[in-house]
């Protein structure tokens, strides 16, 4: 018993082809003709492909041998077959405006025309609109009353000021902003200037140091006649290949240590003058201070002082006695008393210092004249230290 099956005629109107379902390659999927539907327009499609041409291999946008000459699945149009044609666009019409270039910006209308609501802050309608909590939240900071009632506004100026505090002042105070930036910029510029000057101190002192070895002549590096000859140069600027380079580095290292020691001495003198150093003067009748195991004061210092006190004596009962730090020259007095206790010959200098301090004005004028006469040479010696004077002055004022 054999089975037979026939294709219903309703599957397609073009019954002359062997593919009644209309998927490929003889039926179009172009929506313009509603392919694979019951629309009888398919039979009237002049661009439908023929089965005999479907066996031909064509070249399209997808490579050789992949796109048949008929439209295939994408349709029969040239764009669907990958053959895109660029048509020249029509030139734009000639402008009737004879003026070229950017036209001027029109004048902005006044505020009363563009934003009439902004001119009605004093009106009754504006105050009535503020009764709405949603409108009130736009003009007053968060956290205010949201019950729908508006607190009585004393003046219109306060209302406008509160609105500006919410949305920002349209004309900020640029003077305060400028002064806030100008101060740090000036400090930064002054600090950079002092830094550049301070960096020249080692080289200046190095030049002065080496000039002591070449009295009456120009300083010349002695390493140029050694095993590694170099061109004539100053001993303060030796290249790394010069044998004098290591001596130049050693001299500048000593100079840096000397400058640091000088700054430390000045800082200690300044702190000692202001009474901020925990230095105790010697107790009368004792040669040294006793600060060994004594850590805390059981007997407070006499009087009140804003500066810290120190434990200077240790009586036999084991209690420490706190002595307040002197208000001025504590460090200098401590060093002098410490040196006098160990070097007795320093006490012989006291009368000379007292005599020098009691000289007549005539002697002081003579000293000033001598300094004026020898001033240029002293200036050449002390000029490298001039950049340190502003730093010492700032420390003296602000500490």
From Swiss-Prot:
- What are its GO biological-process terms? caveolin-mediated endocytosis of virus by host cell; fusion of virus membrane with host endosome membrane; virion attachment to host cell
Keywords per UniProt: Acetylation, Caveolin-mediated endocytosis of virus by host, Fusion of virus membrane with host endosomal membrane, Fusion of virus membrane with host membrane, Glycoprotein, Host-virus interaction, Lipoprotein, Membrane, Myristate, Transmembrane, Transmembrane helix, Viral attachment to host cell, Viral envelope protein, Viral penetration into host cytoplasm, Virion, Virus endocytosis by host, Virus entry into host cell
- What happens to this protein after translation, modification-wise? Isoform M is N-terminally acetylated by host at a ratio of 90%, and N-glycosylated by host at the pre-S2 region.
Task: Using the UniProt annotation, give all residue ranges assigned to the region (Disordered).
Answer: 85-109
Q: Which residues form a coiled coil?
A: none
InterPro entries, from UniProt? HBV_HBSAG
Q: Which residues lie on this side of the membrane: Virion surface?
A: 2-180, 274-347, 398-399
Segments of this protein annotated with the region Pre-S: 2-173
Gene Ontology CC terms, in alphabetical order: membrane; viral envelope; virion membrane
Q: What does this protein do?
A: The large envelope protein exists in two topological conformations, one which is termed 'external' or Le-HBsAg and the other 'internal' or Li-HBsAg. In its external conformation the protein attaches the virus to cell receptors and thereby initiating infection. This interaction determines the species specificity and liver tropism. This attachment induces virion internalization predominantly through caveolin-mediated endocytosis. The large envelope protein also assures fusion between virion membrane and endosomal membrane. The middle envelope protein plays an important role in the budding of the virion. It is involved in the induction of budding in a nucleocapsid independent way. In this process the majority of envelope proteins bud to form subviral lipoprotein particles of 22 nm of diameter that do not contain a nucleocapsid.
Q: Which family does it belong to?
A: Belongs to the orthohepadnavirus major surface antigen family.
Spell out the protein name for this chain.
Large envelope protein
Origin organism is: Hepatitis B virus genotype E (isolate Cote d'Ivoire/ABI-129/2003) (HBV-E)
């Amino acid at each position: 018993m054999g089975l037979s099956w026939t294709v219903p005629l309703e599957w397609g109107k073009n019954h002359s082809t062997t593919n009644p379902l209309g998927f490929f390659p003889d039926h179009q999927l172009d929506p313009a003709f509603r392919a694979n539907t019951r629309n009888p327009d398919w039979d009237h499609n002049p661009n439908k492909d023929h089965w005999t041409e479907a066996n031909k291999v064509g070249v399209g946008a997808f490579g050789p041998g992949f796109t048949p000459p008929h439209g295939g699945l994408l349709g029969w149009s040239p764009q669907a077959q990958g053959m895109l044609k660029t048509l020249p666009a029509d030139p734009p019409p000639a402008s009737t405006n004879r003026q070229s270039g950017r036209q001027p910006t029109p004048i902005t209308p006044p505020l009363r025309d563009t934003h009439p609501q902004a001119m009605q802050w004093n009106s009754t309608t504006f105050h009535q609109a503020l009764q709405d909590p949603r409108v009130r939240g736009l003009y007053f900071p968060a956290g205010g009353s949201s019950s729908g009632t508006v607190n009585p506004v004393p003046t219109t100026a306060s209302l406008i000021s509160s609105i500006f505090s919410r949305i920002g002042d349209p004309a900020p105070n640029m003077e305060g902003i400028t002064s806030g930036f100008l101060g740090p910029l000036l400090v930064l510029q002054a600090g950079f200037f002092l830094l550049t000057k301070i960096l020249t101190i080692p080289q200046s002192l190095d030049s002065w140091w080496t000039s002591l070895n070449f009295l009456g002549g120009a300083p010349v590096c002695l390493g140029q006649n050694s095993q590694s000859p170099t061109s004539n140069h100053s001993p303060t600027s030796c290249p790394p290949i010069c044998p004098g380079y290591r001596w130049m580095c050693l001299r500048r290292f000593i100079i840096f240590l000397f400058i640091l020691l000088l700054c430390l001495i000045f800082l200690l003198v300044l702190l000692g003058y202001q009474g901020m150093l925990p230095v105790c003067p010697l107790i009368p009748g004792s040669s040294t201070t006793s600060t060994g195991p004594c850590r805390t004061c059981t007997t407070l210092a006499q009087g009140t002082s804003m500066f810290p006190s120190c434990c200077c004596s240790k009586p036999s009962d084991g209690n420490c006695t706190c002595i307040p730090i002197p208000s001025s020259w504590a460090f200098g007095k401590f060093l002098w008393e410490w040196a006098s206790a160990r070097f007795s010959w320093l006490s012989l200098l006291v009368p000379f210092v007292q005599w020098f301090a009691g000289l007549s004005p005539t002697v002081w004028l003579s000293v000033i004249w001598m300094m004026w006469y020898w001033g240029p040479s002293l200036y050449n010696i002390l000029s490298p230290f001039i950049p340190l004077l502003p730093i010492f002055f700032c420390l003296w004022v602000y500490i």
